[in-house]
């Protein structure tokens, strides 16, 4: 019970009004605080600040990854090259802006119910664009079949201007386009993964996707499903 302790606590609090007691109280308070600061410093040693990534807007430095873009109606939008764009799920305004940008095909890799797929297809086709649906999990790595569908479309439609999206445009989209960079543009797995981070891939939540991309060159070289693409160059 705390009730019997209240008079004692009250008297101790009143003592702090005395200047001498206040100095003594502060001196005792400093000891645990200093110990906490020392313990934190041991557990978190100082490191030099990491270098900031090269900005795509810095004229003094080359653009290392895709170009970030501002597009009304969609977020996390990026231009990888002249025919391949990426980003989040667009709203109605976003689809209109993509059509004005010259996008000819929307590639939706969300795994969603058929009603949502039907509505998006209708909206996209009403704007004169093509709609491609490759449903992929937001938590698991893509299957070989899902990537084969994506690679096959790129190979068979080299003049299409694509916008690839999932929900937020960071995790699933990042994995698909990292695989594209490795296969068609011969990027290293590390560089492809760094571009995933550049477009806000959430490594903490999706370690399996990171490991998948790090191991993708070896998997691509061995899987029979990817045999038709092993001698590919950039589709342009």
Task: Tell me the role of every PLM-derived stretch.
Residues 172:
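Glycine/aspartate-rich loop-and-adjacent alpha/beta segment that forms the canonical ThDP
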């Amino acid at each position: 019970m705390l009730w019997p302790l209240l008079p004692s606590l009250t008297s101790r609090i009143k003592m702090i009004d005395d200047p001498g007691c206040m100095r003594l109280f502060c001196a005792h308070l400093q000891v645990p605080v200093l110990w906490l600061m020392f313990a934190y410093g041991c557990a978190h040693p100082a490191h030099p600040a990491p270098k900031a990534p090269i900005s795509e807007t810095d004229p003094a430095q080359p653009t290392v990854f895709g170009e970030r873009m501002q597009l009304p109606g969609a977020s996390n939008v990026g231009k990888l090259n002249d025919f391949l764009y990426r980003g989040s799920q667009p709203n109605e305004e976003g689809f209109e802006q993509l059509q004005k940008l010259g996008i000819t095909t929307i590639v939706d890799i969300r795994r969603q119910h058929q009603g949502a797929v039907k509505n998006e297809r209708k909206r996209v086709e009403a704007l004169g664009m093509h709609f491609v649906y490759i449903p992929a999990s937001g938590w698991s790595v893509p299957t070989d079949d899902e990537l084969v569908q994506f690679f096959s479309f790129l190979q068979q439609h080299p003049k299409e201007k694509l916008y690839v999206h999932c929900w937020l445009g960071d995790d699933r989209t990042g994995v698909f386009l990292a695989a594209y960079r490795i296969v068609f543009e011969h990027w290293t797995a590390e560089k492809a993964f760094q571009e995933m981070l550049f477009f806000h891939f959430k490594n903490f939540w999706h370690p399996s996707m990171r490991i998948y991309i790090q191991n993708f060159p070896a998997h691509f070289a061995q899987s029979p499903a990817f045999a038709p693409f092993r001698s590919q160059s950039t589709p342009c």
